[in-house]
């Protein structure tokens, strides 16, 4: 996993060049957006339990068969595993938004996830719905301007959306 700074330095080093003014400008933009990025990560982390719990409740309200006898989230140990998995995905999305890069999400969370769920008989489409619900909650938090530095957060929200979409697509 390389952060944006390491990538830029590695690119310049591979060419045997100093950082260009364009690369320096890009890094300056990253620094300027850093507080918003960290605020978003902090909001997600501070609300992780509620994000996961509320998303699971919404999923089970839409798909009650999952939590009933014979469902993939029944009995309680399977429900706990479901909540744990949702929390892991959310945690890795928060790492990706902090790093500004999806490689940690891809490498440590998503690679092989579809195959694991298939082997367990877990419906990937239901997992994708849960991830989309976490996405909605996280984007709502990211868009909450209360206590966030002034400025446009649309690119950060779009980036956050991409990470959740990537996670949802990886399980179906």
Curated annotation (Swiss-Prot):
CDD domains linked: PC_PEC_beta
One cellular-component annotation, GO: chloroplast thylakoid membrane
GO biological process, one term: photosynthesis
Localization (cell): Plastid, Chloroplast thylakoid membrane
The keyword Membrane belongs to this UniProt entry's keyword annotation: yes
SUPFAM superfamilies in the cross-refs: Globin-like
Residues that bear N4-methylasparagine: 72
Binding sites annotated in the UniProt record for (2R,3E)-phycocyanobilin 1: 82
Keywords: Antenna complex, Bile pigment, Chloroplast, Chromophore, Electron transport, Membrane, Methylation, Photosynthesis, Phycobilisome, Plastid, Thylakoid, Transport
Main localization of the protein described in the UniProt heading: plastid
Domain of life: Eukaryota
Stored Gene3D superfamilies: Phycocyanins
Topology of this chain in the membrane: Peripheral membrane protein
Protein family according to the UniProt entry: Belongs to the phycobiliprotein family.
Listed NCBIfam families: phycocy_beta
Role according to the record: Light-harvesting photosynthetic bile pigment-protein from the phycobiliprotein complex (phycobilisome, PBS). Phycocyanin is the major phycobiliprotein in the PBS rod.
Self-association and partners: Heterodimer of an alpha and a beta subunit, which further assembles into trimers and the trimers into hexamers. The basic functional unit of phycobiliproteins is a ring-shaped hexamer formed from two back-to-back trimers contacting via the alpha chain subunits. The trimers are composed of alpha/beta subunit heterodimers arranged around a three-fold axis of symmetry. The phycoerythrins also contain a gamma subunit which is located in the center of the hexamer.
Protein name: C-phycocyanin beta chain
Organism: Aglaothamnion neglectum
Gene: cpcB
